[in-house]
From Swiss-Prot:
Name by which UniProt lists this protein: Dihydroorotase
Active site, UniProt feature: 239
Pathway entry: Pyrimidine metabolism; UMP biosynthesis via de novo pathway; (S)-dihydroorotate from bicarbonate: step 3/3
Quaternary context: Homodimer.
Reactions the enzyme catalyzes: (S)-dihydroorotate + H2O = N-carbamoyl-L-aspartate + H(+)
CDD domains: DHOase
A biological process term (GO) from this entry: 'de novo' UMP biosynthetic process
Gene source species: Helicobacter pylori (strain ATCC 700392 / 26695) (Campylobacter pylori)
Length: 339
């Protein structure tokens, strides 16, 4: 059995920087046609020049791949700055509530503040797409739910602004997407295939720790259902986020799951298991093209066959190891060729 996926798109990707970027980028740039690149670096991408420098770094270490760049939402994003970014091809804003995830210490503290709303108004005028890490301070399993009032305010106040709830993790958010025409979402492999049991049901597994947290069986099943039917307001976004094992095994574990090396085979296995392989093309590419208005992307054909694939336990960077999701397991699908 074989399947060919055309122009796979990852609508949420972390490729880090410097040596780590060189070590992990190929896992995404080779099989994927394009990816929305996250701006939460150690020095956030808060303006157009730094964003373009990072884009150049990615392009210098990849080929036939389109990085879709995003700006780190901040109060300094004036109308002039946004116009400059748009002229240079930057179409995405990423809003991080302050302190909610990795490198979000410079995030937005007042989500409904005057300055935040002013930036959003300008973003709407210029046709930007807003991607949001939709969590608010509160009990860890309710953080996304607690952000619903903010999301509703954004959706109603800026009806022409496309708003993406990144890495949807709570089944209660589904109703919001179906209620508001301008609300969309991305789904990760881990949120549609894993639950809290994978993180802490046995021994604590730091390599399954991410934000937003993987949640209950009900959440996983409801979100998986959206993916399997390729809901038209949902696109695939891996949120693949590599960290060194030395940091993952520390007393202060960073959030992030490195899933890039297994994405296409694992999705094939999951969709075949649920008799939904015919919908994988829409989930992995077609929906994103429609939602984000993507055209003239590099052409890619990823051919996968139903043959065993033993997942490596890790990859290397500067003699440090980076653990790969489900490392040591065997998938029933294998990526055979990229053309």
């Amino acid at each position: 059995m074989e399947i060919t996926l055309f122009d796979p798109i990852d609508a949420h990707l972390h490729v880090r920087e410097n040596a780590l970027l060189k070590a992990v980028l190929g896992y995404s740039s080779e099989p994927f046609s394009a990816a929305v690149i996250m701006p939460n670096l150690s020095k956030p991408l808060i303006d157009t020049p730094t964003t373009l420098e990072y884009e150049e770094e990615i392009l210098n270490h990849s080929s036939n791949f389109k990085p879709l760049m995003s700006l780190y939402f901040n109060d300094g994003l004036t109308l002039e700055e946004l116009q400059c970014a748009k002229e240079k091809g930057v179409r995405f804003l990423k809003l991080y509530p302050k302190g909610m995830t990795t490198n979000a210490q410079n995030g937005t503290s007042d989500l409904l503040g005057e300055k935040t709303l002013e930036v959003l108004e300008n973003a709407q005028k210029l046709g930007f797409i807003l991607c949001i890490h939709a969590e608010q301070t509160g009990f860890c399993l309710d953080k996304e739910f607690l952000c619903h009032s903010v999301l509703e305010t954004f959706a109603l106040s800026f009806p022409k602004l496309k708003i993406i709830i990144e890495h949807l993790s709570d089944w209660r958010s589904i109703a919001l997407i179906e209620k508001h025409d301008n609300l969309y979402a991305t789904l990760t492999l881990h949120h549609i295939s894993m639950t809290l049991d994978d993180l802490l049901g046995g021994s604590l597994n730091p390599h399954c720790f991410c934000k937003p947290l993987i949640k209950t069986k009900k959440d996983q099943e409801r979100l998986l259902s959206l993916a399997l039917k390729a809901h038209p307001k949902i696109s695939f976004g891996s949120d693949s986020a590599p960290h060194f094992i030395s940091k993952k095994h520390s007393a202060n574990i960073p959030a992030g799951i490195f899933s890039a090396p297994i994405l296409l085979p694992a999705l094939c296995e999951l969709f075949e298991k649920h008799n939904a392989l015919e919908n994988l093309q829409a989930f992995i590419s077609d929906n994103a093209k429609t939602i984000y208005g993507l055209e003239n992307l590099p052409s890619k054909k990823a051919r996968l066959s139903k043959k065993p694939f033993m997942i490596p336990t890790h990859t290397l960077c500067l003699n440090e190891k980076i653990a790969i999701l489900r490392g040591g397991e065997t998938l029933s699908w294998n990526l055979q060729e990229i053309a």
